[in-house]
Amino acid sequence: MQNAKAKTITITSVKGGTGKTTTVLNIAGLLSTRKLRTIIVDLDLHSGVIAPSLNVQVENDFYDLTSDIANNRFNQIEDYITKYNDYIDLLAAPKDPRMAYKIDPKYINVVLSRLSFKYDVILIDTNHIIDGVNLITYDN
């Protein structure tokens, strides 16, 4: 675990199809060549495609994490993170897009705070809608 707080980078646009996800993946790849521990947080909660883009199988996702925090079942953040390689990890969007509506935005800061001392960089992929989830990420 690191002592310094991670740099948070949020990629956003108010229009869909502008390359947000591609940009996040390219930045993550670049950061990995610099040996910076990076986590991608897929906050395109209704239609996140980071996991399939990386061709990884996700066991637990963002919904599982926030649900467990809300219901006092949370143990450690690592249980919800999917490893891609030595330098890139993923906190995936919900596998079931219906779960996006069940995520309370107040837990986003809790999650980002827990991640901030574990990684050098937090990359956040968002959707194109300005909502409570995205407004919180803009403040980080």
Locate predicted features.
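Walker A/P-loop phosphate-binding motif and the immediately C-terminal alpha-helix
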Residues: 5-46
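Alpha-helical membrane and juxtamembrane elements of multi-pass inner-membrane transport
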Residues: 6-9, 22-25, 48, 63, ...
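Short N-terminal binding/cap micro-motifs at the start of the first secondary-structure element
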Residues: 20, 49, 118-119
